[in-house]
């Protein structure tokens, strides 16, 4: 059988982000990610999100306009859910429980009626980087690509953004995300921490008021706040 030649080098990524991350793409760990990805494709293993959406977070969020980073863990592993944006699902897909709680908090915090769509693309286009720590997953196998090296890539992104930008907001939800705090310079950026929005979290995400706190900070540093309504 002829080998499939899809590989990460062929997947579209915004030019500004490509330059920003150029050094990372040459590192040994990233070459290993590419090798693992190609091996999986050649074994006809279904990977989410689809190849053209793996770098969707970067393609929708302009680097020059980045304001907020919302860190997720890994993509949804059920069909038709993962779209390369943390917590987001495509239009007309049932809203997952964690995203339902995010929408509840938006209502509590900013009186925004819960959206009928779970597509968070409008946030990304305003400068919200919806970044999963792990950028791919095998179908029906949660965290199946956690050993590939994606965390090293996403950690490098967080650290580089912290070093080279100022006045960003990092939303860290749950213990996994909170562990990334050491990568961020809290003298230059706002770090907002809360429980994970999952209904399984022991302590509540609801009441954290991260969305209003983020917008207050953005105004304070002279940036346009985010319109959190889903469009």
Swiss-Prot record:
Reaction(s) this enzyme catalyzes, per UniProt: Hydrolyzes single-stranded DNA or mismatched double-stranded DNA and polynucleotides, releasing free uracil
Family as reported in the entry's similarity comment: Belongs to the uracil-DNA glycosylase (UDG) superfamily. UNG family.
Identification of the protein by name: Uracil-DNA glycosylase
EC number: 3.2.2.27
Described function: Excises uracil residues from the DNA which can arise as a result of misincorporation of dUMP residues by DNA polymerase or due to deamination of cytosine.
One example GO MF annotation: uracil DNA N-glycosylase activity
Main location as per UniProt: cytoplasm
DNA damage among keywords: yes
Signal sequence extent: none
Protein keywords: Cytoplasm, DNA damage, DNA repair, Hydrolase
GO biological process entries: base-excision repair, AP site formation via deaminated base removal
Organism: Campylobacter jejuni subsp. jejuni serotype O:2 (strain ATCC 700819 / NCTC 11168)
Alphabetized SUPFAM superfamilies for the sequence: Uracil-DNA glycosylase-like
